[in-house]
Amino acid sequence: MEAQLSAIEELVAEEINGIALAPYNDSRIRDKINLLSEQGIPVVTLNTDIENTRRIAYVGSHYTKSGSTAAGLLRLMTHGEVHVGIITGSSNILCHTERIAGFTESLKPFSDTIHIAEIVEVHDDEFESYEKTTVLLKRHPEINALYFVAGGVYGGCRSVKALGLQNQMRIVAYDMVPTTKELLRQGIISAVICQQPKLQGSKPLALLFTYLTTGELPDREQHYVAVDIRIRENCD
């Protein structure tokens, strides 16, 4: 978080005209965005949003909906008693908490058969994910499904393989990075939810360009990308 504040300060010192930012969900970042607005520097948030700021737009996933989608996928691919381990990045990242909220809310009507065993934070770190997933699965041997909310997918799946649990585990993750794609091909991961990363990268710049050249605000604040579900058969 300190690194993000420092990066913003460096950009302001270079007299930039606008910022596209994936914000850390912290009051200091919130205050900084509002200060930038007062200084006439527009901000577009991408990939994850932050509440109660004067950013001109957000481009990214509808995270509660993507969490609900993950819950729906899990229901379709499991039967009987299901015990889910949730592996997230950080409770200080809004998109991570919103995904979990959408996921758990959608599973409430099925709480007699689908249970949340535990939620662990791995801070998008593969080594931390490997270690904490190993501890999680040993502490809860009943877990037969994993929901990866953010990064750390490769490390967590390496743990599943090391424990020999790949054939009894259903795994849902996000974003088709090369390692995740390979795990999907191998059948370790059951489904991946993708979020149009190229659009998330290009749209904020287009919105900033239009605002800076014409003075026109975006026609809406939220620009949600489509939810794209991939399984082994359509991962290429």
Give a label for each model feature:
Residues 91, 107, 196-236:
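Hinge/cleft segment of the Venus flytrap/periplasmic-binding protein
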Residues 8, 17-35, 103, 121-179:
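Hydrophobic alpha-helical
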Residues 28-65, 177-185:
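Flexible loop/hinge segments that line or gate small-molecule binding clefts
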Residues 59-84, 129-130, 180, 196-213:
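Hydrophobic alpha-helical segments within soluble ligand-binding/sensing domains
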Residues 3, 66-70, 94-113, 128, ...:
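Short, solvent-exposed amphipathic alpha-helices that sit
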Residues 56-57, 83-91:
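Short beta-strand segments enriched in small/hydrophobic residues
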